[in-house]
Amino acid sequence: MAQKPSLPDSEYHAWNPGLSSNLPTRLLPLITLFRSENSDVGYQQAKEAADFSGLPVEQLCALKVERLVAHEVLIRVTADLSVPDGPSYEYLGLQLRGMVDSIYRGYMVPEMQNIAVGFDLVRQRAKHELTLLVDEICSFDAPQKKPKSGFFGFLKRQPKPIDRTTKPPELEALEQLRQRVGNEDDFPAACMTALINVVSGILGKQGRIVTDRQLIVELALRVFCNDQGSAEIGHLIAPIFENAARAEGYRFLPAQSEPIVMNTKGASAAGKSTIRPQQRLLAERMGVPWEDFALISPDYWRKYLLDYDSLGVDYKYAAMLTGRELEFVDKKLDRYMAQKAKTKTVPHLLIDRFRFDSFKIDSEGDYKSTLLSRFGSTVFLFFAI
């Protein structure tokens, strides 16, 4: 059967977008987490590591310092600064990306060498911690069980051989490591968590621990640096960011003792942003300045993470190419807001994002909110259907 001729670009529309639901194989190396300007590890190398370790491929990129700095600037502009919101949908995104670009290029780039030196120290410390932990797991000696004997057991000529625990020693070591995580500070806890993820993945995929300890350390170090390493960079750039924002005349959002949260829920492309004018009117009726709200809409980050025009005819796949990195930054924003909650510096929040884990339950079936709404004193929920 002859295939239908492809439609010219002008004939594509919302119900016929001209793209498949899966990213074409040829475009996988263009995922932003693996592009050479962003990561020291390309897609193919990360895929091989994922096939070996059982971890998701996106966890095994190796983001460069410059990219991690960009993540931290993105979340700070979003959470800390008042971003002008105009009448059109595009205005907020243009303003946000412009502010991020001004701070990044004007203030972070000149300090990048110093930031890189600081991050290298973080990386060396993490590598040392991980090496010790890997040695601990690989040399772990499982506790022994003494053989049971009856009342007349001493009359037996030969004692029963000592039985070891039925669990493999590396699993026992992992369990003990998990129990220690909650008692550690952020840095060692993050090292432990990264290593637990890697070793668990390898055991699930290979059925045993590998003998190449250096490989385990390297994979765990990637996981650590992409996550906690970014938080450490956040500490390094905090004074630079504050000075930059003040020099540019940007307005810091005031902390609120009783934050108001407006949370818009709905599927991707459901039109959540179209509700914003009504939310603005609601704020006015409550006597709350709209400029005091942090406008959290991660979709506006996409065009900062990727130059759509560079894709040519493949520009329609831009959302897929940025999606995995967007999740990275989104989780970092959650962590940053949790830190602000501890220091009681949370502003009013307008949240416009779609999260699959919004109503996640734990292993015991209990609901535990992961939403930023949990930081609100008064919460308004809006649903776009």
Regions found by a protein language model. Give the residues of each.
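Pre-Walker A (Motif I) flank of P-loop NTPase domains
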Residues: 256-262, 345-347
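Long, basic/Gly/Ser/Thr-rich N-terminal segments
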Residues: 1-241
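Conserved catalytic-core segment of NTP-binding enzymes
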Residues: 373-374, 382-385
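Conserved nucleotide-sensing/catalytic segment adjacent to the nucleotide-binding pocket
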Residues: 288-376
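Intrinsic disorder
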Residues: 258, 266-269, 323, 327
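Glycine-rich phosphate-binding P-loop
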Residues: 262-286
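Pre-Walker A adenine-sensing motif
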Residues: 242-256
